[in-house]
Amino acid sequence: MSQQPKYRFYPTLLDSFQNYVDSDSIWDKYYGTSEDPSISVEEFHDQKRRDLIDNINRVEHESSEAAAKGTCLNEIVDRIIMKQKSSESNVIVKTVRDFDTCVGAFNSVVKDENSEDASELAKETITRINQPFIFASVDGFRFCFDIAFCKEVANYFSDCLCQYRTSATLPTSKGEVELYGYIDYLREKSIFDLKTTKSYSFGNYSKYNQRHAYPYCMEESGMMSEVRDFEFTAYQLSGGNSRTPLITGKQNKEVYTYSRSQSVEILTENCERFIDFINDNISEIDIEKTKIFKDR
């Protein structure tokens, strides 16, 4: 008889742990060739450790522009696929075809205390873009997406099931672990995760735990009899600045054939190492806020 899970992990939390483990090599990749790096390898290591502890404790951080941009594109694509004009998401999405709708879009996010004039912003935006676009805003960031680009992305994921929650239990020598999370897009025997990036090179997502956890969860839970592959569909975005406000992008596909035995081995090792880290640093974990323990 199966035991109740002792821990609950989602893939990006395991990724945060992996970034901490790999902090030296990550530092070397981005700062190793600099004669005067802005951060030392020791400081970078400490930063990744702090990030991990904060993620475990569910500490809220201000969203970055890059993260907000990705969230907005995902929301736009979901609404196009599901033919929804609104959702329960906190992302504001409006199709702008003229000056008045542009003013309305900016009015929905511009706060009086910012002393910004929505009409002036709308006029400047309309003049620069000079074509209909999709306005999206979240966490104080505003973006203008090219309609044709958004439809192209949505068309690629047409007939997909969107934002599907999955979970399953993984046995480890340290205790049962519940793996869980939301799959961006699901079609037949393939699982897709939509990524946005400023620059891309193949293999960017090779160590991401999503490609192991989500297929495992879908098969283990019985929701899919077989998962063939996992695809990171990465869009390298351009635009989104004052000079070129309209955002468009280029598609890059990073596809991994799913091997259950390989993924189980990797997930088990990652979870067991993460559990060791948790036990070694239990004094820094906020038991009241964290959700990594199943029975608390």
Annotate the PLM regions.
Residues M1-Y182:
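Metal-dependent nuclease catalytic cores that hydrolyze phosphodiester bonds in DNA/RNA
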Residues Y10, Q131-D139, F143, I147, ...:
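General structural signal for secondary-structure boundaries
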Residues E35, N114, G222, I266, ...:
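Amphipathic alpha-helical interaction segments
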Residues Q84-E88, S225, I285:
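Secondary-structure transition/capping residues
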Residues T166-F277:
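Mg2+/Mn2+-dependent nuclease catalytic core
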Residues E265-R296:
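Polybasic (Lys/Arg-rich)
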